[in-house]
Structures are given as structure tokens and as C-alpha cells.
Amino acid sequence: KEMHNGKWTKKIGVQLEGKAVLIIGFGRIGRKVAELLKPFNVRLLVVDQDIQEKMKGVEILSINNALPQADIITIHASGEQQIIGDSEFKLIKDGAFLLNAARGQLINEDALINALESGKIVGAWLDTFGVEPYTGPLRKYSQVILTPHVGSYTVECRKSMEMEAVDNLLSAF
């Protein structure tokens, strides 16, 4: 945005190498995330109650054991039940990053706001929300990136989803 406005402001970032990345939900998308992260020499932590197949270089932990170790938490779980609320945010180390590309209701929004204001979470990216379109208070936080539920919004993904739907219909008959 700044460069579009003619400003050349450099902000220092955070390197992935050496960080612990927690993937909550280790289905198809969670596994792809793990594969993409491996070249960055990160420690991969996974929380998934229904894990079907282990992957080399991945540590499978309970959420209570994984959260205190994670520098970055990325959520790709299915379901509708809240996963991260007040008690889970208390376990997270100060200065962590949080990404949610799963379901909005998996994170308690009030607890996330408290974590942002306290510095527990220093950056968040949210692509899903409990109520959409989203008009809530997270819009005012500069350290939060909000996208309008576009994680699967590509031509290729939509075609794949359509083909899968057709296959499911055909296999039912």
C-alpha cells in the first residue's frame, strides 16, 4: 500500500529458519504446508487427533505441549469446535504469529484481541471468520492481515472442487 502511495518504507521481518511452526490439522492442506516449509529448516510440530499417516521430520504433539513451543501457528483443521481460546493463548509464547485458513470459529475472537493487545500474538493472518462478510473489530489492528475467505479462490481450485463434486455424485449412483 505504501509503495502505491509513493513511500519507500522498509520494515524488518522475521526469518523462518530455526523457528518452530505448529500446524493444527494435518490433512491434505496441512501436509502441503509442511512440505513447503521443510526447505526453510524449521521445526515442524503437528496437532491432529485423527492423523492417518506420519511424515518424516514432523513431531506429533498434543495441543498443550505444542503451543508453548511454537513461534508460528497455522490452522488447517476441519470441524466447527473452538480450538484456541483464552486458556490456549495463555500457553503460547510471547511474540508468536497466528494464521487461520480453516474455519473462523476455531479461534475465539475476543481472546485473539487480548493476545494481540498484550503482544502474545504479534501478527495474524485470517482468511475465515465466524460471520462473513466480516465487519468486526480485528479490522482496526495493523498487525492483522484480513482476507475475504479466498484461500480456495483460484480457477484451478474451483475446477478441482467441481470435478470432485461430480465424482462424488456419480459414485453415489
Predicted regions and their residues:
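Glycine-rich Rossmann-fold phosphate-binding loop(s) that bind the pyrophosphate
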Residues: 26-27
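Gly/Ala-rich phosphate-binding loop of Rossmann-like dinucleotide-binding domains
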Residues: 34, 38, 116
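NAD(P)-binding Rossmann-fold cofactor-contacting core
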Residues: 38-56
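Rossmann-like adenosine-cofactor binding region
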Residues: 50-137
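Phosphate-binding beta-alpha-beta segment of Rossmann-like dinucleotide-binding domains, i.e.
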Residues: 1-20, 32-35
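Short, well-ordered alpha-helix to beta-strand connector turns
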Residues: 19, 41, 69-70, 95-96, ...
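C-terminal helix-to-coil terminal segments
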Residues: 12, 131-173
